[in-house]
Regions:
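Short, charged, low-complexity patches
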Residues: 149, 273-282
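Short, gly/Ser/Thr-rich active-site loops of penicillin-recognizing serine hydrolases
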Residues: 178-188, 278-305
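Beta-lactam-recognizing serine transpeptidase/beta-lactamase-like catalytic domain environment
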Residues: 1, 5-269, 305
C-alpha cells in the first residue's frame, strides 16, 4: 500500500512522467550484492509484468517498476536537496505520525537513515541502496498501524489533505436537546500533489479494483472504488515453535472513487496477500452505501430510571 508514496515522489520530485515505460525483468540486478525480485517472479516460474507504465505498476503492484523509479528518484533528489523524498511524502500523508485519535497510540516508524541508526549499531546502521529498494515498496523498517493506513487512504482521497482522526462526533445532553460539544474537522497536514500525480494515482487505484490485484472481488462492484493491495513480508516461528513464512496482508480503499465518502483499511496478520482482503471490505461498503438512515441518537440499554 506504500507504493502510492513512491508514485507521488517519482512524479513530483523525480520528474517521472506517469506514462514512462519500464520492462519488468523479474529479478532486479542493479546491485550485485542485493537483487530483489518482483512478487510474481521465481526461478521455478519466471513470470513478469512485461512493459508497463506507472498506472499499471500500481494496479498490478509491480515491485520491479518501483525499484527502478524509486532508486532513480531517491538518488537524484537526495543529490539535489540532501533529503529523502519518500520520507517527506510519507510523513505528510500520516505514515509513522500521530493520527490525533483520543487514545494512546503507537506511531510506528518510517524507513529512513535516521530510523535505521536508532535500531542498529556499527556498520549495520548504514543506509544503503538495498535499504532504499526495500523502503520504496513499503518494506524495510516501515511500520504503520491500520488507523494510520486509513488516514493515509483518506488523505489520498482528499488530494493530499490529511485530517486528524477522531472517535467522537458530538456530545449531547441526556435528552438530546442540548449540544455540549461537537468535533470539527482538524487539518493535520497538507501535501501539495500535482494534477499529473493525482490523475495517475486515481487511474492506477481504480485499475487495481477493475483489472489488478483486487479485481477478483471488486471488478463488478456497482460503485467505483480506488484501492491498493499490500503484502508485508514476514517469516518466523509460530507460538508452537513451528516455522511459518506466511506474509501479512494489508488493503486500503476509498469510495466512491470520483467523489469519496469513506476510507477503509484492513490488515490481517499472516493473511498472505492483500488482494484477499478486498472481500472483507464488501460487507462494509454494502452497509455504508445501502443505509439511508442517519443515526442521530444512540440506543439505550435496558436501564430503569
Amino acid at each position: 500500500v506504500y507504493k502510492m508514496v513512491t508514485a507521488i515522489a517519482a512524479v513530483d520530485m523525480g520528474g517521472f512522467d506517469p506514462g514512462y515505460i519500464i520492462e519488468d525483468k523479474g529479478l532486479y540486478t542493479f546491485y550485485e550484492s542485493f537483487q530483489p525480485k518482483c512478487h510474481i517472479w521465481s526461478l521455478a516460474n519466471p513470470r513478469t509484468h512485461g512493459k508497463i507504465d506507472l498506472m499499471e505498476a500500481i494496479a498490478y503492484s509491480c515491485n520491479y517498476y518501483f525499484y527502478e523509479v524509486g532508486r532513480l528518484t531517491y538518488d537524484s533528489y537526495k543529490k539535489e536537496t540532501g533529503n529523502n523524498p519518500f520520507d517527506i511524502v510519507a510523513k505528510s500523508l500520516g505514515l509513522g505520525e500521530p493520527t490525533g485519535i483520543e487514545l494512546p497510540e503507537d506511531t510506528g516508524a518510517r524507513a529512513n537513515a535516521e530510523e535505521k541508526n536508532k535500531q542498529y549499531a556499527g556498520e549495520d546502521a548504514g543506509w544503503f541502496g538495498a535499504d532504499v529498494l526495500q523502503a520504496v515498496i513499503g518494506q524495510s523498517l516501515n511500520k504503520f498501524t491500520p488507523l494510520q493506513l486509513a488516514c493515509y487512504a483518506s488523505a489520498l482521497a482528499n488530494k493530499g489533505t490529511r485530517y486528524e482522526a477522531t472517535l467522537l462526533s458530538r456530545v449531547v445532553s441526556w435528552d438530546y436537546q442540548d449540544l455540549i460539544k461537537e468535533s470539527k474537522p482538524v487539518v493535520a497536514s497538507t501535501l501539495e500533489i500535482s494534477e499529473k500525480a493525482l490523475a495517475a494515482l486515481d487511474q492506477g487505484m481504480r485499475m487495481t479494483a477493475s483489472i489488478g490485484t483486487a479485481e477478483q472481488y471488486l471488478r463488478d462492484y456497482p460503485i467505483p472504488i480506488a484501492c491498493k493491495t499490500g503484502t508485508a513480508q514476514w517469516q518466523g516461528t509460530t507460538s508452537t515453535g513451528s516455522f511459518s513464512g506466511s506474509d501479512h496482508a494489508s488493503f486500503v480503499l476509498y469510495a466512491p472513487a470520483d467523489n469519496p465518502e469513506i476510507a477503509i483499511s484492513v490488515y490481517v496478520e499472516r493473511g498472505s496477500q492483500g488482494g484477499n482482503l478486498a472481500n472483507v471490505c464488501i460487507p462494509i461498503l454494502d452497509a455504508y452505501f445501502s443505509s439511508s438512515a442517519k443515526y442521530e441518537t444512540v440506543a439505550t440499554e435496558n436501564i430503569a430510571y
